[in-house]
Design a protein with these regions (language model features):
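Enzymes that bind and transform nitrogen-containing heteroaromatic metabolites
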Residues: 1-164
């Protein structure tokens, strides 16, 4: 199964200048819980934006067109197809961004773990549009803004009803 893990603003933004335009502590814990023990697939820019590399307890697979790219703790894939081969036989792989990588895997994704952030923000990276007719919501949980959080948010799990 191919899953996406993403935090998305009300206007579809997932990033700004190589980082997240918000801070939500409990969402970072949820991200860790969802991805722990699974291969995480990301683009080079997402890899470079991580405060700690590699993400511990997970295979870190970085998709990049840079033939000379190497980084300790990262397995490198030149294409989505190569990343899929590296993940062959695993029950679930988690695609964690960025925008270009989400677009490349979009026809193949089975599940979305979304954190919908109750903000409209400026940003330079966006999440693909989610068509309601393609997805069935299996879980929804509202969280009000905590003291150290930027905003309230809703945690959702959506499963694709039919593949493209």
């Amino acid at each position: 199964m191919i899953s996406y893990v993403a935090a998305v603003s009300k206007n579809g933004v997932i990033g700004r200048e190589g980082g997240l335009p918000w801070h939500i502590s409990s969402d970072l814990k949820r991200f860790r819980d969802i991805t722990m023990g699974k291969p995480v697939v990301m683009g080079r820019k997402t890899w470079e934006s991580l405060p700690r590399r590699p993400l511990p307890g997970r295979r870190n697979i970085v998709i990049t067109r840079r033939r000379d790219f190497a980084s300790e703790g990262a397995e490198v894939a030149a294409s989505p197809e190569e990343a899929l081969r590296l993940c062959a036989g695993v029950p679930e792989m988690a695609v964690i961004g960025g925008g270009e990588i989400y677009r490349l895997f979009w026809p193949l994704v089975d599940r979305l773990y979304l954190t919908e952030v109750d903000l409209e923000v400026d940003g330079d990276t966006h999440f693909p549009a989610v068509s309601p007719g393609e997805w069935r919501e299996t879980e929804r949980e509202l969280h009000l803004k905590a003291e150290r959080d930027t905003a309230s948010f809703t945690l959702r799990i959506l499963d694709r009803m039919t593949k493209k």
